[in-house]
Swiss-Prot record:
Residues involved in Zn(2+) 1 binding: 204, 209, 228, 232, 309
Membrane spanning stretches: 157-177, 179-199, 239-259, 261-281
Single Gene Ontology BP annotation: mannosyl-inositol phosphorylceramide biosynthetic process
The protein's Enzyme Commission number: 1.14.18.-
Pathway: Sphingolipid metabolism
GO molecular function: fatty acid 2-hydroxylase activity; iron ion binding
Annotated localization: Endoplasmic reticulum membrane
Binding site for Zn(2+) 2: 231, 286, 290, 306, 310
Protein name: Ceramide very long chain fatty acid hydroxylase scs7
Membrane topology designation: Multi-pass membrane protein
Amino acid sequence: MASVTSEKCVILSDGTEYDVTNYLVANKDAADLLRRYHRQEVADILNATSKSKHSEAVVEILKSAKVPLKNKEFSDLVDQNIGVGYGNEFIVKPTDLDKDFEKNHFLDLKKPLLPQILFGNIKKDVYLDQVHRPRHYRGSGSAPLFGNFLEPLTKTPWYMIPLIWVPCVTYGFLYACTGIPFSVAITFFIIGLFTWTLVEYTMHRFLFHLDEYTPDHPIFLTMHFAFHGCHHFLPADKYRLVMPPALFLIFATPWYHFIQLVLPHYIGVAGFSGAILGYVFYDLTHYFLHHRRMPNAYLTDLKTWHLDHHYKDYKSAYGITSWFWDRVFGTEGPLFNEQGKISTKAK
């Protein structure tokens, strides 16, 4: 097992990474101080008018690092100081709201966003270019969408998804078992679970990313932003990441009626229940890919894969819970090299 002092230690300052591992190994007395700032942005501390003993020590340590690490390519957005690191190590940097609006003249993040799109006379080409250039709202709050009593309806904490839908899945499966044998019910439940992965891919690629096929009209651009554009514009907003239950109900109802048309009632209920569980996995996976460190290599690659979709190429990597259907339909994205293997350069 590696000693505490031999483990890699990186400190961030103004979007630049400093590898101070060698200093830590040579100066074991500084280990506690350095570990305190590992993978943290310290620019505000270092630039403070009244520096503490600790901040002065960190300044000297960064100077001793001599050459900062070059950030791994993370699209041209890294150059815009939007974040540092990659994959599990990616850390967002808050957007300077005033400078962003002054530079791009797109949306003022301090004002309600939907009215700006609806009444702002924004052309589609400008909208599509800007909405796929992520911004990060300061603090733990959310940028306003409506700016009125409707605002709370646009926010959904992640835990509401299992809290609402897992009981529905359980009830649906048990209900199906009253009309068909358990073995049949569980078979179609599993089929529904895996069918969701195709629905997930199809919905993300052909519905949420209509993009160029969206009519060049403020109403349609506003709808695009409300459905998915907002998430690409503000990907780190933890309250506008999972799908609001009311919106999911609107999406799910036509699918339920379609399944009831093509399958016997109880079989349809079993399959639909499995698909709903697939959706729960999808939404939770999506949330944690954005907001948690992944515990193993596969999930770390999956996180990298999804961040590529946001920060490198939004026209690829549509799968969230897996890349299976992207491999089938040739939309793998930057994580895979030309031989179809995970590219070490992408990491």
